[in-house]
Structures are given as structure tokens and as C-alpha cells.
């Protein structure tokens, strides 16, 4: 997959791709069903806003396709892939588990429904065994630990665009439609009715 495309395009293009993770010879895979684009120094919701560059976010300034893993709330981790612009990247928000599902469920604590295994950015990190120590700064196009495979093509009419989740105090950037997900996919983390017009869907916010 060509990573050398603008961040918002990459966020859409990643939908339908298979995220694969190998640990001690065992591989788990999930189809990416939800993403968010963070556009770099101009984006007030982005870790690199204003050109901010630290050891924590340095992966966002590396070549397109570099994995960026960070922690929230001191315990949960989130997985991102850098895009071609300096400081920009795509947050992978949700997966549809497809291979090694029982192992993914076990990592999530055992008795978890399939749709709840990886329907959130930190849930998917737990399910896939993605940690900052192991995966941050890995290049996804050349890693034996984590990589992408072709899944299925997601046509434009299948893609819903909406506001990113949990963005506060960022002015106009709170309203930017930079979150993308596959329409009617039950593994998406959160669906807002207004993003789907008159269609009857719930609006449920899940664990990060």
C-alpha cells in the first residue's frame, strides 16, 4: 500500500485493510473499520500542533508508514500510522477481528463479544498486543512484528465521515470531518445518528 498520500486520504484508504501482528510466532489479524486523521502542525487536536516535536511524538515526523504508539490516562495505548506530511498521522480506532480471534479475546479478558474485542483504539491495542515499547517507530511496510495486508476494497459510498471522538477546546477543529468508518459495520466504536441522516442507529460511546 502506498503510504505517500495526504493524511485524510490515507485515513480513508486504510479502511478495509488488514492490520496484522505477530507475537512469538502467532499472528492475529483484524480489518480496519474506523480511522481518524490528524493533520499535523495546523491541527489543534494533533500532538504535533504548532510544530511541537518531542521524544514522545517523534514517530510522527518519521517516514510515512511509521507506527506511533502513545499512552492515554496513564494506562491505555493508542496506535497510529504516520502519513507523508511532517507531524501528521492516522489513528486506527477500530478493527473487525478476523484471524486469531480467540487469542485476541483472551487478551481482552476472556468473556468478550466479538464486536467488543477491538471496537476502540485502546481495545484494539490490547487485543493485538500493540505496545509503545514493542511497536512505536516500527515501519509498517518493513516490519516482521506488524504489517498491513490487502483486505477488501471499500467504496466511497460505504465510507461515513464525521467529527473525531473526544476532541475538546480545539475551536473549529472540533467540527472537522476527519473521522472515517465503514457504514453499517457493527465493529465501529461509536455511531452518531446525525452522521447517517435519518437512518436508525444508536449513539454509544465505548471505552477508548
From Swiss-Prot:
Descriptive protein name: Probable DNA-3-methyladenine glycosylase
Function: Hydrolysis of the deoxyribose N-glycosidic bond to excise 3-methyladenine, and 7-methylguanine from the damaged DNA polymer formed by alkylation lesions.
A Pfam match: Pur_DNA_glyco
Superkingdom to which the source organism belongs: Eukaryota
GO cellular component assignments: nucleus
Keyword Transmembrane attached: no
EC number(s) recorded for this UniProt protein: 3.2.2.21
Keyword Cell membrane: no
NCBIfam families named in the record: 3mg
Family that this chain belongs to: Belongs to the DNA glycosylase MPG family.
Reaction catalysis annotation: Hydrolysis of alkylated DNA, releasing 3-methyladenine, 3-methylguanine, 7-methylguanine and 7-methyladenine
Main location: nucleus
EC top class named in words: hydrolase
Amino acid at each position: 500500500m502506498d503510504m505517500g498520500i495526504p493524511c485524510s486520504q490515507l485515513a480513508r484508504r486504510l479502511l478495509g485493510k488488514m492490520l496484522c501482528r505477530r507475537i512469538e510466532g502467532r499472528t492475529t489479524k483484524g480489518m480496519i473499520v474506523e480511522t481518524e486523521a490528524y493533520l499535523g502542525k495546523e491541527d489543534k487536536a494533533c500532538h504535533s500542533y504548532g510544530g511541537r516535536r518531542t521524544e514522545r511524538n517523534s514517530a510522527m515526523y518519521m517516514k510515512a508508514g511509521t507506527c506511533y504508539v502513545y499512552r492515554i490516562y496513564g494506562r491505555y495505548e493508542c496506535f497510529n500510522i504516520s502519513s507523508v506530511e511532517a507531524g501528521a498521522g492516522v489513528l486506527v480506532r477500530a478493527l473487525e477481528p478476523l484471524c486469531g480471534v480467540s487469542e485476541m479475546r483472551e487478551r481482552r479478558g476472556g468473556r468478550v463479544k466479538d464486536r467488543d474485542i477491538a471496537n476502540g483504539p485502546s481495545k484494539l491495542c490490547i487485543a493485538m498486543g500493540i505496545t509503545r515499547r514493542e511497536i512505536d517507530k516500527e515501519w509498517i511496510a518493513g516490519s516482521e512484528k506488524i504489517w498491513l495486508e490487502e483486505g477488501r476494497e471499500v467504496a466511497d459510498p460505504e465510507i461515513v465521515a464525521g467529527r473525531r471522538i473526544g476532541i475538546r477546546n480545539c475551536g473549529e477543529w472540533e467540527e472537522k470531518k476527519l473521522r472515517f468508518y465503514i457504514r453499517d459495520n457493527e465493529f465501529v466504536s461509536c455511531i452518531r445518528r446525525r452522521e447517517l441522516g435519518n437512518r436508525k442507529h444508536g449513539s454509544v460511546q465505548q471505552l477508548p
